[in-house]
Amino acid sequence: MPKIKRLPDEVIKKIAAGEVVERPYSVVKELVENSLDAKAQNINVYIEEGGLGKIVVEDDGIGIPPEELPDALLRHTTSKIASFDDLYYLESFGFRGEALYSIAAVSKISIKSRVRGENNGYELIAHAGEVINLTEVGMAYGTVVTVSDLFFNTPARKKFLKSGQTEAGLIRQFIEKMAILYPGVKFSLFIDGKKIYSSAGIQEQLGLLARFWGLEKGNLLMLEEKLGEGFFIKGGIALPPAGKPHRKLQVFAVNKRLVKSGILTKAIDDAYESLLPTGLKPLVFLEVVVPGTWVDVNVHPQKLEVKFMDEQKIYLDVRTIIRNKLVNAKSSSLKSFSPARETNTKSEDNDYWQVTYFAEEFSGNSDKLLEKEDIFSTSDNLTFSLNKDFAKELNFQVIGQFSLKYIIVEKNDKLLIIDQHAAHERILYEKYQTKLNPFYSQVLTFPVRIKASPELEAFLQENYQNFLEIGLHIEPFGPGEYLVREIPEDFPQNNIANVLEEYLYEIMEQKEQVSFREKALKLFACKNAVKFGEKLTYSEMTNLVKELFKTNYPLSCPHGRPTIYELSLTEINKKFFR
């Protein structure tokens, strides 16, 4: 049996570094936070090759005295705290003394710094944490940290990184968030020699938020509410119906520290309940300021999560304030939506089914039911083979629509409950499959601008040709933004920007091992299919069921979800002990 023994110092260093430095973004985050702790008013960030080639962070902060420079690379050396109790009164980002130690352990690092009152600065050079040189240099006041060859001594770490473009995108998004959180500090970001982002540093948070979300200032509401001694809520929110189909542009901060918080996410979702169209997430930039004794910031290696002492109070106060602000906002853009998931025909006081329409018998050929314009009509005269006996005959009777989600059908002594969205998805998918090209494009009169996360930005560039082949012409329009000039001719016309963003993210995140075109076909059918919550006429329900029974695979949607739940008369009789 192996003996217990101490790990070599080199291994300990690399393990510790891995907890703090996961990727180039981690390096930039730690260095920028150090600059802010040093009271910097100007912070410039330069990256090459997504940060793997070089990262430079320069600031005009208070600097590091030359006699302290070697100590800066030692583990658990810090100027931020002196005792454990100081953790409850933190006014800085750093406190563990691990950031520079961890970065230096997996890179080649240079730290140049000059404090006020000194004629010159000093430069410390280290490789893999070992000091190589300390020399006097000429430089402006402040600190410049240069990190080169990141992970040069841990090559396995590089294998888990995304493309350089994705890494650069994560850094850009971080800088944008910090510029909003610290509007009085001027931030600049340079990627491969090109200036990508800069803020003015003039305490103008509203404009920075509008730019970050791609919205007009009039669609935003700024917040600053005092809820108690040392307890504030600050930031900004987007007024409904503005929203995104994802949470990537939601930002939370606690005591000036960017964090992820399930409690704050839940509070925001509940505050926006019924005010946003189904499928959209709120746009929020929320900073919670609380006394240090209310929160534990030492629960995550990268300080990305915090723990509130009284989570219920935080949840209730945040939800109430945001909800009241939204409801009372005097904006013409604020109107209430009833999400489809909450729309139902069930009474609050009576637990019984209530159907929207009652049936006439359908024998497969009744012209009078088709007088209204039919959203499920099939003019292509396509012939489908059937794969189930019950679907071979078109004799059935639609009973009605339940909860604006399901169609209730009687067929051959069976009760069928049909998912209207999944059924229409199957119909459209097979219809598109038979078309020579279901993705004929149409040129938009006014191009649509969309915001792209770093991951989506890389995905769009890698699949430019694939998107052209499915009728989407998307081109770059500045950092993190794209213009959509052409869309497929059958693409939904309402709320194009949000539907398109959702469509793109879903294609990107699909893990199914099928072709790009196949993924696009399935999602295209999904986006065009009738939704839960849509009221259907008797004619529309009848034709939807008829066309479903004509498909090759009527029992499931293209993604594999069932379309039909079947109850036999025998099963129903048993429930009534007959």
From Swiss-Prot:
One of its GO terms (cellular component) is mismatch repair complex. CDD domains: HATPase_MutL-MLH-PMS-like, MutL_Trans. Pfam families: DNA_mis_repair (PF01119), HATPase_c_3 (PF13589), MutL_C (PF08676). InterPro entries: DNA_mismatch_repair_CS, DNA_mismatch_repair_MutL, DNA_mismatch_S5_2-like, HATPase_C_sf, MutL/Mlh/PMS, MutL/Mlh/Pms-like, MutL_C, MutL_C_dimsub. It comes from the Bacteria. Keywords: DNA damage, DNA repair. GO terms for molecular function: ATP binding; ATP hydrolysis activity; ATP-dependent DNA damage sensor activity; mismatched DNA binding. PANTHER family: DNA MISMATCH REPAIR PROTEIN MLH, PMS, MUTL (PTHR10073), DNA MISMATCH REPAIR PROTEIN MLH1 (PTHR10073:SF12). This protein is involved in the repair of mismatches in DNA. It is required for dam-dependent methyl-directed DNA mismatch repair. May act as a 'molecular matchmaker', a protein that promotes the formation of a stable complex between two or more DNA-binding proteins in an ATP-dependent manner without itself being part of a final effector complex. NCBIfam families: mutl. Belongs to the DNA mismatch repair MutL/HexB family. This is DNA mismatch repair protein MutL. The gene is mutL.
